[in-house]
Structures are given as structure tokens and as C-alpha cells.
Amino acid sequence: MLLNLFKFSKKLFQENFNKVKLLNHCKSFLFLGESDNKFFTNEKSELVFSDKRDRPFSSDRINRPFSPDKKGEPIFPDKRDRPFSPDRINRPFSPDKKGEPIFP
């Protein structure tokens, strides 16, 4: 009985090990199917971007829309014209968008 338990645990371990191996193999090819060549994976399966402007997220672009030419300048040069600002959270916008709340 102890021998059967050992065989079962060995078989279970081998199945789980194979699943982890397959999962890691799939992860390494996750981003290789993209055809636009904006990014690729290196040998460590990390996402590598060919150009800094192609990154989908950058810490200095939080809550800031991208400009059409992707140079990093915001579309709205005036802070009052931005559709979202962290200091306006949970506060309705005024119709003239000057920053005053609708309900004082």
C-alpha cells in the first residue's frame, strides 16, 4: 500500500511538473504573435519595447491623453481643459469647464 501511494504521488508530481513546464513555454511565446513589430520578447520572456513612445503605460503619462504625434505632449495644453484631473475626483464639472463644481 505504501508503494502504491509513492507511485501515485510520483505520478501526480510529474503531471504538475509537466503543466508548469508547458505554462512557462507558452508564456515565452505570448507576445511573439504580434505583427506590428512594436515589441518582442527577449530570452528572459520579458516584454521589450522598440521605442519608448510605444509603451502602453508610462508613469509620467498617468491621466494624461497622448498627443496625436505621440511626442508626449498632452492634447489639452491648458490644465482647465483636461477631461480628468486628480484634483477633480468625485467632483462634477462646470459647464464652462473652468473647474468650479456645478453644485457649490
From Swiss-Prot:
The region called Disordered is annotated at: 55-104
Primary location group = plastid
Name used for this protein in its record: Uncharacterized 12.4 kDa protein in rps4-rps11 intergenic region
Species source reads Euglena longa (Euglenophycean alga)
Species lineage, top-down? Eukaryota, Discoba, Euglenozoa, Euglenida, Spirocuta
Q: Which UniProt keywords apply?
A: Plastid
Cellular compartment(s)? Plastid
Give the record's GO CC terms: plastid
